[in-house]
Amino acid sequence: MIPLQKDNQEEGVCPICQESLKEAVSTNCGHLFCRVCLTQHVEKASASGVFCCPLCRKPCSEEVLGTGYICPNHQKRVCRFCEESRLLLCVECLVSPEHMSHHELTIENALSHYKERLNRRSRKLRKDIAELQRLKAQQEKKLQALQFQVDHGNHRLEAGPESQHQTREQLGALPQQWLGQLEHMPAEAARILDISRAVTQLRSLVIDLERTAKELDTNTLKNAGDLLNRSAPQKLEVIYPQLEKGVSELLLQPPQKL
């Protein structure tokens, strides 16, 4: 067998067959091979139960084989990630006018950087979800209390005056008072429904963030920025003032004496 060449990786040459890489794939140590060549190597190594990189002999796992990347423009191995264009670049791309003023990271640093950003965003959204759920429970409780007060007021109206100081004229004015408050309930209930929908969408976004962070590699690195820029359905600081302006102003008032 021809000795593996260690200096041909940047030129897009497979160290096993010594030809141009075809469907380039890489071991987890980052060396590139033709898919067919590496597959054959893995099949032979499987018999012994030990799989090592054909080039550097570092132990590898068959399950962590990932797609390698060759620059489609220059047929050289990519080595940097451009944050502006979100593209993987080779050494020739780096000196091109298109990318010279851009900020690039090594692929290893980019993976670490974006994984931390994904996890940080996920943690922040989980806190937002918890706060939204707290507000939702708080508003539901207040709405239930208002409904109870209205029902209780109607019951006392039907029962008649409890004392000489509480005339039927006074009691007769109560339904209009409760009806005025009840007019606000559908709109506030709709806001609570909006919170429920926002929580559902935020949970979906958190799942995507955590899955991408866990599986982040060169295959998914280009999509990490798009995911980080995905807007939450509605900012917590927007929803909360709506609640405070509506339901809270109405329900934080002292209970009316009947």
UniProtKB/Swiss-Prot annotation:
Tissues with expression: Highly expressed in normal gastrointestinal epithelia but that is down-regulated in gastrointestinal carcinomas and chronic inflammatory lesions of the gastrointestinal tract.
Zinc fingers typed B box-type, residue spans: 66-107
GO process terms (BP): innate immune response; negative regulation of cell growth; negative regulation of NF-kappaB transcription factor activity; negative regulation of non-canonical NF-kappaB signal transduction; negative regulation of protein catabolic process; negative regulation of protein localization to nucleus; protein neddylation
GO molecular function term, any single one: zinc ion binding
Signal peptide residues on this chain, from the entry's feature table: none
ZnF (RING-type) ranges: 14-56
EC id: 2.3.2.27
Catalytic activity: S-ubiquitinyl-[E2 ubiquitin-conjugating enzyme]-L-cysteine + [acceptor protein]-L-lysine = [E2 ubiquitin-conjugating enzyme]-L-cysteine + N(6)-ubiquitinyl-[acceptor protein]-L-lysine
Record-listed Zn(2+) binding positions: C71, H74, C93, H99
The family this protein is said to belong to: Belongs to the TRIM/RBCC family.
Quaternary structure and partners: Interacts with NEDD8.
Record-given protein name: E3 ubiquitin ligase TRIM40
